[in-house]
Amino acid sequence: MEVPAGNILDAEGRGVRVLMSGLDYERVVLSGIGTGIMAACLDEIMPYMVARKQFGQSIGRFQLMQAKIADIYTRLNSARSYVYEVARACDRGQITRADAAACVLYSSEAAMLVAHQAVQAMGGTGFMNDTPVSRIFRDAKLMEIGAGTSEIRRMLIGRELLEAMPA
């Protein structure tokens, strides 16, 4: 296919480089989706923890459920802090491919762990297809496989870190 000269980005034959140059920023943007998934999980399970009664009390009073809440809260805030820090590096023009990939890797895997815990916390209700937590769980899985799998992200991070080592 012939591309008019006025539509060519960068130099001829370097289109892949132009395309790849935006991937680091895309990875940071996608990382924000992971934090949104985790926040949605917390928003869904908190009212459930209060409303659902077992043995005459809210299940949120059980230590194991409190531990789930604590783990979700901690992962959410850890991922959010990392995403914000890498986003600030983007704003300063100091983004690294390893940080962008690590950010989306951590955020997506944390989102999957959190979504799994949200389903667990809600039991059978959380697994039903018509509940938000079930949809969130499926969305979280997509974060691990869409726009590059976790395995590809790990390979990229390892390669970037090794290439940065002095010879």
PLM feature spans:
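Alpha-helical interface subdomain recognition
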Residues: 12-14, 18-167
